[in-house]
């Protein structure tokens, strides 16, 4: 059976991603000074203005306006004619302390209050909120990610690269990409459509822009094995994209959760990542779920693997764990679930220790996806549990 599936990505200059990066830059600054910082920071960006609000408990002192401006300038909003730039934008902050009622459950989990012994203060942590989280992996790409979101991210990254390196100096920071893949019997066979919308200077013609984007962005990214003469290419289909960024669209933290994860291929629990320290299971448990899924697929136990975790606020252990291999399991699924629960520890404190999450690593995650990347900071992408999983099945 043939079918089409589409995923999108956005550049670091997209308003929602500007907000995500500001929130995570603030988080990083606090974790750098105080790894025990509790942070939940939301950002709004609009014409000439940034608003930062949230709840923070920390010993750190950070100049939030300085972080905001530095982040905006690094993204590329450096000129007032863009309608938004790091030098002149206003910055309003409204930060207060975390609710002590929440802290009661996070500092000491229900299990600890009930007499369960733990190794240290970190393992005593309860979940920072209730919620459901999904992790996924597939062997259809070397990154163990679905191909549509993988290519969409690569195109978005390439848009930023050619802009920043001056290869296409007429590009501006805002942009979006979208890739439609044709599947046959659950295998990707060709790229059906590539869509790129990119902000640009007013004096570049649509024809010249299209030619440049095809030559310098699409051709270097889309693999030959997935191309044919039927592949459709759309570049700025409205015909003009001069007004962009926060001047054209208000941006908010947490509005690109599908871009951040698997491009819509699997369900999403709804919780965003950026601006949240790792005691928030919205972030840390999603990372752990991806870690488990990637190692399971890399171990050859399934071609596709989905795991769902759920938590209750103030409770360390998950309320539930579900797995789904979509009929691709190479081993007994009941045993697979049992093995996973035995060799992976899903308590928030254990996740934080295993993945080394109390570090200022989050700004980099806030654009181009949290998964399928090989940088050192992305510890949840490591394949260091493959051998242990194989041993459990005598493989």
Curated annotation (Swiss-Prot):
Compartment annotation: Cytoplasm
Q: Which domain of life is it from?
A: Bacteria
Q: Which GO terms describe its cellular component?
A: cytoplasm
Swiss-Prot/TrEMBL catalytic activity = L-methionine + ATP + H2O = S-adenosyl-L-methionine + phosphate + diphosphate
Does the record's keyword annotation contain Transferase? Answer: yes
Q: What is the protein's quaternary organization?
A: Homotetramer; dimer of dimers.
Q: In which pathway does it act?
A: Amino-acid biosynthesis; S-adenosyl-L-methionine biosynthesis; S-adenosyl-L-methionine from L-methionine: step 1/1
Under Gene Ontology molecular function, one entry of this record is:
ATP binding
Report the function annotation for this chain. Answer: Catalyzes the formation of S-adenosylmethionine (AdoMet) from methionine and ATP. The overall synthetic reaction is composed of two sequential steps, AdoMet formation and the subsequent tripolyphosphate hydrolysis which occurs prior to release of AdoMet from the enzyme.
User: Which CDD domains does the record associate with it?
Assistant: S-AdoMet_synt
Question: Which family does the UniProt entry place this protein in?
Answer: Belongs to the AdoMet synthase family.
Record's cofactor remark: Binds 2 divalent ions per subunit. Binds 1 potassium ion per subunit.
Q: State the needed cofactors, names only.
A: Mg(2+); K(+)
Gene Ontology biological process terms from the UniProt entry: one-carbon metabolic process; S-adenosylmethionine biosynthetic process
Q: What residues does L-methionine bind to?
A: 55, 98, 249, 280
Specify which residues bind Mg(2+) according to the UniProt entry for this protein: 16
Q: What's the encoding gene here?
A: metK
Q: What is this protein called?
A: S-adenosylmethionine synthase
Task: Tell me if Nucleotide-binding is a UniProt keyword of this record.
Answer: yes
Report residues binding K(+). Answer: 42
EC numbers? 2.5.1.6
Give the principal location in a single coarse category: cytoplasm
Give the residue ranges for region: Flexible loop. Answer: 98-108
Pfam families (UniProt xref): S-AdoMet_synt_C, S-AdoMet_synt_M, S-AdoMet_synt_N
